[in-house]
């Protein structure tokens, strides 16, 4: 069972490793160089996070499993989300192992594996604040989103929708 789990993890990681194509090395190049350079983010628990100054989480566990079977070194670097995809697109890393919303713009630069996790997006308000109960009630309000997030790029779409609906 442990060996088959390792094989499954290896296959999943290898699929992810070559899912980003922008300036990323392919398998023969990685084998020749002897190292797969992987970027993960620093604050996306339970997938990627720091624990006492060390990488931790599900993705670290997957990379540890890959290290058992790969014929090359696996070098994990922890980056803030805001620079993660740019670092892969410029060739500093062979792949990113992280959660990312698939957008048309990102598809022009990256290849993605099939999803293996999903996340929901919510708007959050202060407890007891009854002024915000629908998306429409965001009209005229200041909103914040994560820097580098695909949701940031969708704010003009939200603004247009709110202007149209009043």
What are these regions (language model features)?
Residues 1-9:
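Bacterial N-terminal signal peptides that target proteins for export
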């Amino acid at each position: 069972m442990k060996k088959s789990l390792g094989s499954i993890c290896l296959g999943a990681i290898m699929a992810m490793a070559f899912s980003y194509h922008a300036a990323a090395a392919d398998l023969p190049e990685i084998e020749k160089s002897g190292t797969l350079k992987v970027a993960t983010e620093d604050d996306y628990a339970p997938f990627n996070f720091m624990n006492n100054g060390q990488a931790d989480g599900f993705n670290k566990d997957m990379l540890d499993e890959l290290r058992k079977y790969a014929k090359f070194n696996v070098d994990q670097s922890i980056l803030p989300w805001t620079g993660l995809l740019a670092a892969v697109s410029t060739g500093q890393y062979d792949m990113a192992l992280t959660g990312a919303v698939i957008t048309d713009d990102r598809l022009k630069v990256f290849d993605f594996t099939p999803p293996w996790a999903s996340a929901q997006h919510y708007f959050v308000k202060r407890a007891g604040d009854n002024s915000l109960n629908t998306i429409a009630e965001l009209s005229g309000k200041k909103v914040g989103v994560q820097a580098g997030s695909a949701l940031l790029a969708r704010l003009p779409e939200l603004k247009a929708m709110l202007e149209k609906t009043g």
